């Protein structure tokens, strides 16, 4: 992945082989991203080192992938706290608009 510049809301865009992923948040070595024009259900991607998971925004369940238990608990807690902001970003991205950054867990 390569940083290709900042967005108007302070998000970074990460280029992968398939798409550009706006970075929503980074905390404790965990990178949270979303894809433009993504399929339902509403979800985000969490990456920690070599591990990655797709997490449902609606119920904070793991749709696919794996994170170590400690990081998984942190990501799920963060997702529950920020569910409204995540859904707002999902709607923005469905309309191909730049998402907002979300505060890291403290």
For each predicted feature, which ranges?
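Residue-level preference for alpha-helix termini and adjacent loops
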Residues: 23-26, 54, 61-62, 66, ...
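C-terminal structural segments of small proteins and small subunits
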Residues: 74-106
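Short, functionally important structural connectors and interaction interfaces within domains
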Residues: 19, 47-49, 54, 59, ...
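Intrinsically disordered, low-complexity boundary segments flanking structured domains
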Residues: 19-22, 42-44, 88-89
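A short, structured beta-strand/loop element
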Residues: 35-69
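A cross-family signal for N-terminal binding/gating loops and helix N-caps
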Residues: 1-30, 36, 49-51, 62
């Amino acid at each position: 992945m390569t940083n290709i510049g900042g967005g108007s809301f302070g998000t970074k865009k990460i280029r992968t082989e398939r798409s550009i992923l706006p970075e929503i948040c980074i905390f404790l070595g965990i990178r949270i991203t979303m894809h433009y024009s993504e399929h339902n259900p509403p979800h985000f991607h969490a990456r920690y080192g070599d591990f990655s998971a797709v997490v449902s925004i609606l119920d904070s369940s793991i749709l696919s992938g794996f994170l170590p238990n400690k990081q998984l608990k942190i990501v799920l807690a963060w997702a529950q706290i920020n569910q409204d902001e995540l859904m707002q970003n999902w709607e923005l991205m469905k309309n191909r608009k730049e998402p907002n950054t979300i505060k890291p867990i403290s």
